[in-house]
Amino acid sequence: MARTTPIGRYRNIGIVAHVDAGKTTTTERVLFYTGKSHKMGEVHDGAATTDWMVQEQERGITITSAAITAFWQGSEKQHKDQFRFNVIDTPGHVDFTIEVERSLRVLDGAVVVFCGTSGVEPQSETVWRQANKYGVPRIVYVNKMDRAGANFLRVIAQIKQRLGHTPVPIQLAIGAEDNFQGQIDLMSMEAVYWNDADKGMVPVRKPIPAELQELADEWRSNMVEAAAEASEELMNKYVDGEELTNDEIKAALRQRTIAGEIVLAVCGSSFKNKGVPLVLDAVIDYLPAPTDIPAIKGSDPDNEEKLMERHADDNEPFSALAFKIATDPFVGTLTFVRVYSGVLASGDGVINSVKGKKERVGRMVQMHANAREEIKEVRAGDIAALIGMKDVTTGETLCNADKPIILVRMDFPEPVISVAVEPKTKDDQEKMGIALGKLAQEDPSFRVKTDEETGQTIISGMGELHLDILVDRMRREFNVEANIGKPQVSYRERITKNCEIEGKFVRQSGGRGQFGHCWIRFAPADEGQEGLQFVNEVVGGVVPKEYIPAIQKGIEEQMKNGVVAGYPLIGLKATVFDGSYHDVDSNEMAFKVAASMATKQLAQKGGGELLEPIMAVEVVTPEDYMGDVMGDLNRRRGMILGMEDTVSGKVIRAEVPLGEMFGYATDVRSMSQGRASYSMEFKKYNTAPSHIVETVTKKQG
């Protein structure tokens, strides 16, 4: 089958933002204007087409990023052919940053939505940081221009100040709040208005109102200057006072946006149907096609040192990244993939190069909001869901078995909070095991383990809301009723002293014995190293090369058990520098045990300390309650970092230990009569004070 849309007309984009910037409403409008959903869904009435899990509709927030395929030819049909958009809607709640992170990983560009009133909020910073990490070109869309206190240019200034990027507006707002009427298009230098009759489908262009002409001229020259900086040739033309054509300006702005040098900004009101078609036009004009960005990097499964790459081309070997696993009541497991290269037809065999397992693709579907279309093949640049994958987890690579590659992996954060779950009845016991397994496969930031001493099932995640929603899904989707214990903090441990320790494991009693012997130098790891930093300094073959990995494994396994109170050890540098072996009795197992015994001795010799997770907390509160909120944060051992005034109230930034924040949602509401809101995300681990160490050690017995 031939390709229906050339890859140059693909746009794989995400719509990202923080809670309540109006992101899902914007996605809804995108679907409406691109003709895929003829009834607009509103988040207010719980009918939005991308929010398809029941909890999302109830809570009015988006949890799973649905991938939707849509087509667009331009707001005034200015393009000869249609462009194919694959749009990924992402959650903005900080407990789901992992969802945002993995969506950004497979996107080529993003539309970052800000609220015209509240501007840059705590979560916008998180999302912006993630987009920087993956080098995603983006456009800023300032939404909710019809809201009281909305001000486009103020938000632009805030982005510059708080996010360190200077946005280049390609539009200005005409009016604001109740009087918001439309935009000034700085490219064509016209005013653009919208009709309620066609729900803001087709822009109506008129001359710029006289009172805004001067402002428009000023920002037009700002835009032209940004374009001129794209090349020496344009700069010379600009300096010589020659006019740049709109085509030259567009091409230059596109080039600089894709290179990540500038961020273009547009405005509108999705809810009032004023402006989304122009956002779609900007996506076509300024965001990259899969062929405009560098080839994806990867490594050879047999030799991680050997780097490889795949270009966005149908003729290259097939490679794709699984970026989301969803359980569907009708077809079972859906594996959402982004195809980077090659072609895959249904029925083909592929290999999961991370696990080295073969998989056969059953059916393939593309999602259009909440309808599905079955397709026969996927090609480079496509995003689709595969049905029939047996053992694929988020972040793994599917590729051609003859030409395997492991695409750059995603990093998933370690969970910071745990609770015990117990099934209510015997029947629930087995169902709960299956349900938790499926949920963990979908969400790598959610972990399940069994406590060996108590036999309890412990689930861990990124925050209270994260675990609440997972337990809720277990009840709804898998009919499992469970009792939930009190949240527990996931502490960590580290050593503070340098020491040299001998690990020796000898068992020789007739026949084949065991002999492992090593000397290890332990120290706190170098800055920025979170896990084990393992160094081999053995010379002269006193410990044969083949036993070195076993020593590393022995240390890693023992690190899980800690040295103070049984919590995992982090930031450890271990240098194996000496030892001995026995020709007959030495084997990998013996060296693993020897290394494990050496690591155990850190409890006496390593000066271990307990670390507690510290959260970055931002509370937005009306001024009347500020004293109470700050006093309360201080009582929770919080460190206030600063405050600022915003339209929505005072913003207090603080760092607070997670252990003191349980139940904060209820407390902050009652303190402020329901008017304050807060967000928090994991920041770092800090040394825990002595009273916490005492309580924790006592509890661990």
Curated annotation (Swiss-Prot):
User: A GO molecular-function term, please?
Assistant: guanosine tetraphosphate binding
Q: What is its main location?
A: cytoplasm
Q: Which organism is it from?
A: Pseudomonas syringae pv. syringae (strain B728a)
Identify the keywords attached in UniProt to this record, alphabetized: Cytoplasm, Elongation factor, GTP-binding, Nucleotide-binding, Protein biosynthesis
> Would the keyword Membrane turn up in this protein's UniProt record?
no
Instruction: State the family it belongs to.
Output: Belongs to the TRAFAC class translation factor GTPase superfamily. Classic translation factor GTPase family. EF-G/EF-2 subfamily.
**What name is this protein filed under?**
Elongation factor G
The cross-references to PROSITE patterns, in alphabetical order and at most eight, read: G_TR_1, G_TR_2
Boundaries of every tr-type G domain copy: 8-291
- Which chain regions cross the lipid bilayer? none
Q: Which GO terms describe its cellular component?
A: cytoplasm
List the disulfide bonds in this chain.
Answer: none
Q: Which SMART domains match?
A: EFG_C, EFG_IV
Protein task:
Catalyzes the GTP-dependent ribosomal translocation step during translation elongation. During this step, the ribosome changes from the pre-translocational (PRE) to the post-translocational (POST) state as the newly formed A-site-bound peptidyl-tRNA and P-site-bound deacylated tRNA move to the P and E sites, respectively. Catalyzes the coordinated movement of the two tRNA molecules, the mRNA and conformational changes in the ribosome.
Binding residues annotated for GTP, in chain numbering: 17-24, 89-93, 143-146
From the broadest rank down, the organism's phylogenetic lineage runs: Bacteria, Pseudomonadati, Pseudomonadota, Gammaproteobacteria, Pseudomonadales
Per UniProt, subcellular location reads as:
Cytoplasm
Q: Which GO terms describe its biological process?
A: ribosome disassembly
